[in-house]
Amino acid sequence: MQCHRDLALSQALWGWQLSKQSGWAHPSLPHSPLPSTVHSCSWAPPHLQRHLPLATVSPGTTQLTQGPAGRTLGQTQASCPEPRPSMDAVDATMEKLRAQCLSRGASGIQGLARFFRQLDRDGSRSLDADEFRQGLAKLGLVLDQAEAEGVCRKWDRNGSGTLDLEEFLRALRPPMSQAREAVIAAAFAKLDRSGDGVVTVDDLRGVYSGRAHPKVRSGEWTEDEVLRRFLDNFDSSEKDGQVTLAEFQDYYSGVSASMNTDEEFVAMMTSAWQL
């Protein structure tokens, strides 16, 4: 019986059924490589530029360098790191996990993060290698013992022999430019009126707009359908109806990976959250 409950929990939390399509902020776009260089973020709306790092909004001073798997890392020209000659074993493991998550949609990273936070029943925000590997297996992601131990060692911040869950989840998110991180933070700040770092599904419902969603424009979905599909990512009988900044970032990191340019991503966020 416990096995069945665990399986149902993992399926519900993961939300990775191939037949399910998520809503807005989850556009069905191909994972195409990003342009290797963008020289200015001056396209950002003026009222959002105050949320962006100065280096990002100063025309001609920022270069977005292409990161792993075609995604971008925000770097200023003066501090662009030299490319590493090869990927170490742990980085290769992380890239494998990230790719498997993203292959299952924009909510893939968020689903994995939510599952592991639920698995952390004692609230320690840590997992040992066996717990980590078994949790991945329940989600259909397989690592051998050496790979799991390598990941745990890399994110063992206190020498306890366990993986720091939040550090691992942050590292798993697809890299984003500073412009994308800033507009995500601006959207969450608008929702988080109390400043306690938590918003409710009702908060999302009260602000979110799907009118610019491509499937609304094409007539395939109504605005209500888009809203329902989006909220399903955060609200169900297995979820608590509350959304933290980390969960919001988890979700939008997956969305970001499917959008070609910073301009496109910022425009989507501006429309969806009426920034």
From Swiss-Prot:
Designated gene of the protein: CAPS
Chief location bin: cytoplasm
Assembly and interaction partners: Monomer. Does not form oligomers in the presence of calcium.
Pfam families tied to this protein: EF-hand_7
Annotated transmembrane regions: none
Domain named EF-hand: residues: 107-142, 143-178, 179-214, 222-258
Any one of the GO BP annotations: intracellular signal transduction
Location of region: Disordered: 59-87
Organism whose genome encodes this protein: Homo sapiens (Human)
Localization per Swiss-Prot or TrEMBL: Cytoplasm
Positions contributing to Ca(2+) 1 binding: 120, 122, 124, 126, 131
Binding-site residues for Ca(2+) 3, renumbered to this chain: 192, 194, 196, 203
Name of the protein described by the UniProt record: Calcyphosin
Effect of residue 180 to Q: Found in a consanguineous family with intellectual disability; uncertain significance
Molecular function as annotated in GO: calcium ion binding
Superkingdom of this protein's organism: Eukaryota
Role description: Calcium-binding protein. May play a role in cellular signaling events (Potential).
